[in-house]
């Protein structure tokens, strides 16, 4: 019989004097009794036997086996070995899925599909981790929900990454993340856009640079400069200005502030006299340094002007207009008593001016109609009363009691009358006026009665 020391022939030989081979768990060598072979030949024989045996009971090496027994580079082992969890957080996994998508947005199901296709560990554990993905999408500000468009049917909303959160990972490494991203509050988001929609241009607009702008505001005493941080045209939107919602000067009379002369401004004031007051203002001096009327020089006139809201000397106007009692008015101003309302004097002047324009004689409040049996006597009485109203009553009130040609002395009644208070003088003037009218009427009635007796 042919014998050979070749181990391969020994395995296939039906009659063999050599004992059976023993297989080691780690590919050990086979030992044969009675065969003198070297250590190298025994090792080669053991490797050949391992190739011919079933490998189902062979454990994969720690570094990974060959073929199907080896694991992939994502931390997963073979189908029969334990799977290793990837070292990425859920935020990193979601960011990976969104950034690799063509439109940079995915639904929840699309994010889960990407994670399972990339990491077999999560495919084996699905769907236990799906709720964790959903919670991270809702609770982190770096992810934004995008509603579906009307023409894009489907289930669920899209999720995208906030553009300001793209650099939340250090150097693009998903293993290292900076501190948690917080979204800045935006002023455009309101619960009621219909209410705040008209005001949105104010805070959506970019800030206006704080550049000082000077503009003149005309007033009664001249022009004054005001410094503002920016032009009002930069603050208010043009559409709102066109609608005059924020035009605070829309109802103001702009022409009132355009005149440069003080006389033009006061001609448009409602309390100024339209008739006699125009001539009075023309006669007034325009310089504030000139002496006023009775009751003080330039100092008193200047002091009264700043106390009064009107930019003219009231005592000077009263003196030029011939208003009764202007000396007492000037004394009150010089004594620091403040200013008085000129409407008391303007009412009478307006009444007289309107009466002159209409051409009637009803403006004289002292005119009296007296009835008698003789029309001729009535005409005489009417003419006499008219003459008293037009001639005597327009004279200074002192002339009703004293003659105008009489010279006043220190002990005369006229001097004592001038020294009395204004209220007492006014009451005496009214009483004297009524007395003269009653005397005149009684005189005419007495003449009419005597003529009737003579005719009888």
From Swiss-Prot:
GO terms for biological process: anatomical structure morphogenesis; cell differentiation; regulation of transcription by RNA polymerase II. Residues 1-29, 55-80, 280-305, 351-392, 404-429 are annotated as: Disordered. Residues 1-17 have a biased composition (Polar residues). During embryogenesis, expressed in neuroblasts derived from procephalic region, ventral nervous system, thoracic sensory neurons and brain cells. The keyword Phosphoprotein does not apply. It holds the Pfam family Forkhead. GO terms for molecular function: DNA-binding transcription factor activity, RNA polymerase II-specific; RNA polymerase II cis-regulatory region sequence-specific DNA binding. It is found in: Nucleus. It comes from the Eukaryota. InterPro entries: Fork_head_dom, FOX_domain-containing, TF_fork_head_CS_1, TF_fork_head_CS_2, WH-like_DNA-bd_sf, WH_DNA-bd_sf. The keyword DNA-binding applies. This is Fork head domain-containing protein FD3. It comes from Drosophila melanogaster.
């Amino acid at each position: 019989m042919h014998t050979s020391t070749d181990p391969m022939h020994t395995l296939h030989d039906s009659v063999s004097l050599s004992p059976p081979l023993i297989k080691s768990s780690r590919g050990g060598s086979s030992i044969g009794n009675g065969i003198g072979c070297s250590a190298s030949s025994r090792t080669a024989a053991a490797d050949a036997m391992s190739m011919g045996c079933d490998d189902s009971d062979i454990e994969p090496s720690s570094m990974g086996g060959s073929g199907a027994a080896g694991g992939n580079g994502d931390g997963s082992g073979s189908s029969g070995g334990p799977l290793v969890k990837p070292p990425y957080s859920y935020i990193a996994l979601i960011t990976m899925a969104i950034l690799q998508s063509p439109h940079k947005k995915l639904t929840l199901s699309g994010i889960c599909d990407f994670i399972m296709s990339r990491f077999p560990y999560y495919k084996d554990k699905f769907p236990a981790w799906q709720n964790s993905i959903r919670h991270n999408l809702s609770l982190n500000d770096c992810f934004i929900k995008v509603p579906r468009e009307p023409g894009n049917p489907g289930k669920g909303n899209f999720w995208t990454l906030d553009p300001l959160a793209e650099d939340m990972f250090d150097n693009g490494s998903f293993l290292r993340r900076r501190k948690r991203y917080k979204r800045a509050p935006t002023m455009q988001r309101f619960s009621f856009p219909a209410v705040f929609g008209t005001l949105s241009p104010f805070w959506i607009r970019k800030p206006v640079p704080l550049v000082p702008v000077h503009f003149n505001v005309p007033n009664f005493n001249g022009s004054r400069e005001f410094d503002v941080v920016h032009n009002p045209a930069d603050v208010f939107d043009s559409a709102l200005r066109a609608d005059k919602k924020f035009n605070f000067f829309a109802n103001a009379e702009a022409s009132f502030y355009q005149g440069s002369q003080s006389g033009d401004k006061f001609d448009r004031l409602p309390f100024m006299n339209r008739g006699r007051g125009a001539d009075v203002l023309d006669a007034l001096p325009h310089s504030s340094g000139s002496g006023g009327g009775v009751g003080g020089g330039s100092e008193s006139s200047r002091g009264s002007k700043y106390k009064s809201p009107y930019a003219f000397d009231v005592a000077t106007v009263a003196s030029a207009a011939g208003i009764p009692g202007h000396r007492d008015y000037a004394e009150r101003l010089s004594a620091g008593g403040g200013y008085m309302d000129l409407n008391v004097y303007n009412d009478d002047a307006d009444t007289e001016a309107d009466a002159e324009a209409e051409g009637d004689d009803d403006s004289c409040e002292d005119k009296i109609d007296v009835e008698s049996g003789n029309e001729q006597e009535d005409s005489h009485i009417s003419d006499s009363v008219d003459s008293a109203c037009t001639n005597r009553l327009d004279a200074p009130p002192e002339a009703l009691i004293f003659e105008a040609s009489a010279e006043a002395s220190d002990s005369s009644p006229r001097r004592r009358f001038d020294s009395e208070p204004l209220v007492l003088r006014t009451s005496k003037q009214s009483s004297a006026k009524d007395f003269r009218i009653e005397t005149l009427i009684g005189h005419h009635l007495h003449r009419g009665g005597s003529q009737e007796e003579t005719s009888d």
